[in-house]
């Protein structure tokens, strides 16, 4: 009986707290990550800077040696 009551109280508490935080980011890091993911403008890498799949070179440059940590070079 005591176990059942404790279980019911726990479930009520969890359901109330889960419903209260809906739509809110708990951590600032999550806010900045979601803002960054939604951003359509990204900084590009200049000539001689490192590039990857996510850090792209500026227009007119290409990423050479990308699989090993590439560099932006002229097209």
Swiss-Prot record:
Keyword list, A-Z: Disulfide bond, Knottin, Neurotoxin, Secreted, Signal, Toxin
Compartments where located: Secreted
InterPro entries linked to this entry: Conotoxin (IPR004214)
Any one Gene Ontology molecular-function term assigned to this protein's record: ion channel inhibitor activity
Keyword Secreted among UniProt keywords: yes
Superkingdom: Eukaryota
Propeptide: 20-42
Tissues expressing this chain: Expressed by the venom duct.
Extent of the signal sequence: 1-19
Cysteines joined through disulfide linkages: 44-58, 51-63, 57-72
GO CC annotation, single: extracellular region
Pfam family, one: Conotoxin
The keyword Disulfide bond appears for this protein: yes
Annotated family: Belongs to the conotoxin O1 superfamily.
Free-text note regarding domains: The presence of a 'disulfide through disulfide knot' structurally defines this protein as a knottin.
Name recorded for this polypeptide: Conotoxin MiEr95
Protein source organism: Conus miles (Soldier cone)
